């Protein structure tokens, strides 16, 4: 008994029962909420997975679409050589290009305008740095010098004053010109011109492209130059490989184009030792594709249409941008 004269135990019993009843009610409410929320969470998880962008390969030549929940990223694969046949576009490609909210290329339009002057500064800076180094030509055999002379003429002596990569770039352009494939009539040049005053954004920085051109130390640059000289010694073979690249592009044969692109990359680093080939491919392809994969996913989440034009080799064959997106769960 307490001071009120009422039994303690019945009061305690009622209080405990009341609290137990409240606890049971709360537990029931929580349980009910869980039952209601779980299907919703499951639904959200399904929606999240389903919201990943999907890849569509359109019937138009080397034309893909990454379709996201908010917008689409259309990708036109290109090749660096040129001919009139390559400039015959299907209507849909140009319609999408003209109506796109955003335009992207490997290099943005502003960087394209500034590239020549930036490249010249890099060349001069390198020449001053190697002022006391032996000329590039002194590292080459008589047979290699003959090949350079027949391709570059007297310009090879001027080019020898710069770092070896400069002669390599000049030689590659000369070899392309000898195939009669006019690089001035390529797809990229056409689309830059068609864009007019519209801004084209860059997938890469101008610094990245300079790093690709000037890849390696002096000895490695000479190794890459000699590999290109070896390729140029068989002009018919080189022309045949570029011809195969053009044919696979025109026929929209993505498998063949991926194979030819990979073979050409391997030939320009032929016999390179010490992991040079692996590091070169990482610089010109692997690292860029990884960055593009992230960028394409980001763009697919934006409203509107993004149009991208870039080398088709990055989208065909093994370890393509699309493969990387799938591995990183950025694409269905």
Curated annotation (Swiss-Prot):
InterPro entries: TraB/PrgY/GumN_fam (IPR002816), YbaP-like (IPR047111)
Membrane-spanning segments: 27-47
Membrane topology: Single-pass membrane protein
Recorded superkingdom: Bacteria
Keywords recorded for this protein, A-Z: Membrane, Transmembrane, Transmembrane helix
Subcellular localization(s) per the UniProt record: Membrane
GO cellular component: membrane
Main location group: membrane
This protein's name: Uncharacterized protein TP_0675
Species annotation: Treponema pallidum (strain Nichols)
Lineage, top ranks: Bacteria, Pseudomonadati, Spirochaetota, Spirochaetia, Spirochaetales
